[in-house]
Amino acid sequence: MAHARVLLLALAVLATAAVAVASSSSFADSNPIRPVTDRAASTLESAVLGALGRTRHALRFARFAVRYGKSYESAAEVRRRFRIFSESLEEVRSTNRKGLPYRLGINRFSDMSWEEFQATRLGAAQTCSATLAGNHLMRDAAALPETKDWREDGIVSPVKNQAHCGSCWTFSTTGALEAAYTQATGKNISLSEQQLVDCAGGFNNFGCNGGLPSQAFEYIKYNGGIDTEESYPYKGVNGVCHYKAENAAVQVLDSVNITLNAEDELKNAVGLVRPVSVAFQVIDGFRQYKSGVYTSDHCGTTPDDVNHAVLAVGYGVENGVPYWLIKNSWGADWGDNGYFKMEMGKNMCAIATCASYPVVAA
């Protein structure tokens, strides 16, 4: 019992210390806060090694916990998380030996079971009926660029983090709206995901349990607008709607849907219009994506398979493999600075089954 209490205290200290380290990584070694965080990390390391034994792998796990601000309740949980971490590390190593066009890496999800990850980061699968017959008007194909990255145009807002809430659809929605607004006005803006979590249920959305950008665009259109992030900040839990019309910053005039499975339409929209909200099926393994062009023979290709909404901000070719460039909502320390590439041309993981973009008032 005494050992468990020491471990719990050490891990609690770790969570505070890791936050300080994450927010102060550029501090010089002379910073007076540094010795405190180093001592806390040392205490955690000793506690973890005490629970697991002094091995190189246990030390790697302790350093992982420090880096990501982990906090575990008991020695039993440390051992369980260590087992999951070990399995994740083996998956990374075995996948990276296969010569695939992408690579995996250890990240903040590497000590989570697949069931935990699904419950806290993904939404329930929903049928995207709005895309059965799309209304995107194809633009001149001759003007379509060979590659596109809307970040270079300065209209893509920074990567955000949905945290422990299946609200990916709200971040895909606001990402598309923020890009459209900046494109139309030349002004940057951050919009409220929490408003969508709390208020868009009447349009077949379910807060932290999932939703669709196309349905969120319709909600905003009929609601009369969406508040700023500052006026309606993100909490990452389901709450009571307290939208205030006076804080509405962007109005949606209409939404445009890409025809089901039509990657040519999607490429036309991404290349010639602006970033497009898309959804796809996340399967176990993708959560540890690090770089390269993701491809899989195991994910689905129908609207009923999708469980995660994101934002397509461009496309290109890497080592001969065409790809979609996609902004995620799992933080800037995930993947390739918060982004990933998905193979283009095969409706990979149903990426072209649930795509739409908004038209906003300037």
Curated annotation (Swiss-Prot):
Residues 1-22 form the signal peptide. Glycans are attached at N188, N257. InterPro entries: Papain-like_cys_pep_sf (IPR038765), Pept_asp_AS (IPR025661), Pept_cys_AS (IPR000169), Pept_his_AS (IPR025660), Peptidase_C1A (IPR013128), Peptidase_C1A_C (IPR000668), Peptidase_C1A_papain-like (IPR039417), Prot_inhib_I29 (IPR013201). Pfam families: Inhibitor_I29, Peptidase_C1. It catalyses: Hydrolysis of proteins, acting as an aminopeptidase (notably, cleaving Arg-|-Xaa bonds) as well as an endopeptidase. Its EC number is 3.4.22.16. The active site is at C168, H308, N328. It is found in: Vacuole. Induction: Aleurain is synthesized by the aleurone cells stimulated by gibberellic or abscisic acid. It comes from the Eukaryota. One of its GO terms (molecular function) is cysteine-type endopeptidase activity. Disulfide bonds join C165-C208, C199-C241, C299-C349. GO terms for cellular component: vacuole. It is an enzyme of class 3 (hydrolase). CDD domains: Peptidase_C1A. GO terms for biological process: proteolysis. Keywords: Disulfide bond, Germination, Glycoprotein, Hydrolase, Protease, Signal, Thiol protease, Vacuole, Zymogen. Residues 23-143 form a propeptide. The keyword Glycoprotein applies. Belongs to the peptidase C1 family. May play a role in proteolysis leading to mobilization of nitrogen during senescence and starvation. This is Thiol protease aleurain. It comes from Hordeum vulgare.
